[in-house]
Amino acid sequence: SHFFEYLINTSRIYWRKEMEYAFDGNLNAMSKYHAQHPFDIEGVSLTPEEIKEQKANLINKIFTFGYMMHHFKSPERAWAPMAMDNKIGEENECNGRSGKSFFFKVLSILMKTVKLSGRNPKLMDNPHVFDQVNQHTQLLLLDDCDRYLNTGLFYDNITSDMTVNPKNNQSFTIPFEDSPKLAFTTNYVPSDFDPSSEARLIYMVFSDYYHQKTEDNDYLETRTIR
């Protein structure tokens, strides 16, 4: 499927070695190879270790997609995906446009979703932050999270009941088994890799196979999902 092809390419973290560096600037050879290997997780010039890493990256995405789609929830296996870019720029910031949001856009078509902007690091200071959530919500997506957003404040909502405090209405609690699964996307390297975070988050890494060429980078072209 086209979606599986997308998953493969967002897992090709060594695509530049495979598709550019191996041809020493020969654009015709690059183009020919790309046409022959548009969705190849086992690049010809990659080492066994690099191929293994790319396959693990792909399996991680497949597992995460299946986990999010499954409506059964277990307190012992309650996780939230944290999607980030593999390529890190200055000040631990990524350029984005790697396809992270598309992963959850597909999920949002299949799941009843509430999306909140994670750009506000004080998001959880709002007592009505979950105002849009109800017992029918299946996915709560915190998109484009700020580097200073404390994801630890959401951990109780990942592993237990969720309390919703709507504006001008009475608060209510959604039992864990009926509460939405959470997910995060960010353009920054998470600052917390403590045991508590690792027990609750599924880290997802997206390659820069899909990218935008600008004056500030050395990409040869712009490559998009479409």
Predicted feature residues:
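P-loop NTPase catalytic core of nucleic-acid-dependent motor ATPases
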Residues: 1-134
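Conserved nucleotide-binding/hydrolysis micro-motifs of P-loop NTPases
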Residues: 88, 146-147, 187-191, 207-212
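Conserved catalytic/switch belt of AAA+ P-loop NTPases
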Residues: 112, 150-174
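AAA+/SF3 P-loop NTPase mechanochemical coupling elements
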Residues: 128-135, 166-185
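Conserved AAA+/SF3 P-loop NTPase catalytic/coupling segment centered on the Walker-B
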Residues: 136-159, 191-198
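Structural recognition of the conserved hydrophobic beta-strand(s) that form the central parallel beta-sheet
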Residues: 139-143, 177-187, 204
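Signature of the SF2 helicase/ATPase Hel1-core->accessory helical subdomain module
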Residues: 155-162, 183, 201-208
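Phosphate-sensing "switch" segment of ASCE/P-loop ATPases
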Residues: 176-179, 194-226
